[in-house]
């Protein structure tokens, strides 16, 4: 380890000669031209009494040595994932407030001198930063730094990896949440699945082993692909890392969307009973498993169900220069401001030491974390890449994919391995080819309506109203819109508590081959049928109380209407979701939205065919309210 810039004796004097107290709040900002220097916030006698082999400034009050630093190079990204950013978008930091290359290297140099031996570059998407290769090359010159890693979405990886390897990059994590090209495009709102697979292929070709693939598992989106991801490790030196879905500001975390480590493990063991656990490395965040005879392995990142705080050795620096000692904490210290105020190396170390000293024993747990205010993930780093819950896939879309995955799992795995061994760029998985033919869907629409009628409904810190009863009420055998004399009556919701209400409904329009082809190619004389239907669905949701006589008026905070073309049935699958905070549910708004979108699609196509059938108008799910949640199976 490199020599320490400040001796242990000097550090003891500094700690003993200054009194301090701490409330646990973030470090205050320095006055212009005058850096604020903080001392360690609590005594740590074991550091003063023993000759510590590791920097006192990077050792917290629980004895954890922080030897791993993650640096975000940018807040920007070349994908537009539905669950990486809040719906209202992310205001990017002005360029002048971001760390410069020299500031990044200055901080990295300081941390390495104190004992950090591993640095991982993150984002945003780090590979869109123009000087990323130069940064890696200069980091490689730091004495004592053993590992330089990068976490990327893989879009630019194949092109840049040869240069990065030459510069000194030693580890790669690639974020990929699905093996189905159509679903990939649905998730990230961009094409690029084959570029990601090409990047994985290039990493293997250049000798990186294992190549780590990060997959955030979310119920209703990709939990049905667990076995496909594991099958890839049979012939490829991959470490597929399944990550429990975690809450961040703006992603409306829902516990029901989290698939726990034990549930995932049970799923894998049903297919591979011989799955064996591997020894865990010290400070590892992953629980590793291997199937005998497979080249690669599988890991689980269990931040929510079984945290690993006791061995945490990680610190994070955001793109705007703030130090985060815990990924889930909202306390940050601006190292950038101290740097620009002219703080000396010793002063910077004391600021860092104060922040590390305040690090808690463990994070708050999954239920409390979901209520905490924190940065959106895109503004921290891309480690787990995309933590939000996207709109649920239409049930017919999801079920079609699941059937194909199960039917062709072995073929898909062997096809991928054959392609890798052959050195070619992997093509679309068999599952996608069977569902879509040889190409991706030509058209996909997704729209959002955000209303400021009730802005509080999206706040993760908004206190929940007390429930009217200790549990959900059973379904009633009485009609609530009929009074005791059998006459219609509007339900009085004035005494019901306000709660977050979400409902999803779907409809299917069986178009027939002629109308389907015209819509697919956007050749209808009336114009863009999907866009018109989409807009009609949004309008209908807002007007539901005027169409359904006894329906209450609801101040909707969000409406989303999606249309997918299903070529196997020559059909359009419509999904409408509505959200509001109030005393009554929004299932009627969702159902009306889906139904009117289907009617509008019929109207656009009726000149071509009157044999069109509107089918399967149904409620898919609802959450919130005294009667509990409903999810159609």
Swiss-Prot record:
Its EC number is 4.1.99.22, 4.6.1.17. S-adenosyl-L-methionine binds at residues 83, 124, 175, 246. Gene3D superfamilies: Aldolase class I, Molybdopterin cofactor biosynthesis C (MoaC) domain. The modification N6-acetyllysine is found at residues 195, 525. SUPFAM superfamilies: Molybdenum cofactor biosynthesis protein C, MoaC, Radical SAM enzymes. The modification Phosphoserine is found at residue 61. [4Fe-4S] cluster 1 binds at residues 77, 81, 84. GO terms for molecular function: 4 iron, 4 sulfur cluster binding; cyclic pyranopterin monophosphate synthase activity; GTP 3',8'-cyclase activity; GTP binding; metal ion binding. Residues 410-633 are annotated as: Molybdenum cofactor biosynthesis protein C. GTP binds at residues 70, 120, 151, 212, 314-316. It is an enzyme of class 4 (lyase). The active site is at residue 603. Residues 1-380 are annotated as: Molybdenum cofactor biosynthesis protein A. Pathway: Cofactor biosynthesis; molybdopterin biosynthesis. It comes from the Eukaryota. InterPro entries: Aldolase_TIM, Elp3/MiaA/NifB-like_rSAM, MoaA, MoaA_NifB_PqqE_Fe-S-bd_CS, MoaA_twitch, MoaC, MoaC_bact/euk, MoaC_sf. Residues 61-295 form the Radical SAM core domain. Isoform MOCS1A and isoform MOCS1B probably form a complex that catalyzes the conversion of 5'-GTP to cyclic pyranopterin monophosphate (cPMP). MOCS1A catalyzes the cyclization of GTP to (8S)-3',8-cyclo-7,8-dihydroguanosine 5'-triphosphate and MOCS1B catalyzes the subsequent conversion of (8S)-3',8-cyclo-7,8-dihydroguanosine 5'-triphosphate to cPMP. PANTHER family: MOLYBDENUM COFACTOR BIOSYNTHESIS PROTEIN 1 (PTHR22960:SF0), MOLYBDOPTERIN COFACTOR SYNTHESIS PROTEIN A (PTHR22960). In the C-terminal section; belongs to the MoaC family. In the N-terminal section; belongs to the radical SAM superfamily. MoaA family. This is Molybdenum cofactor biosynthesis protein 1.
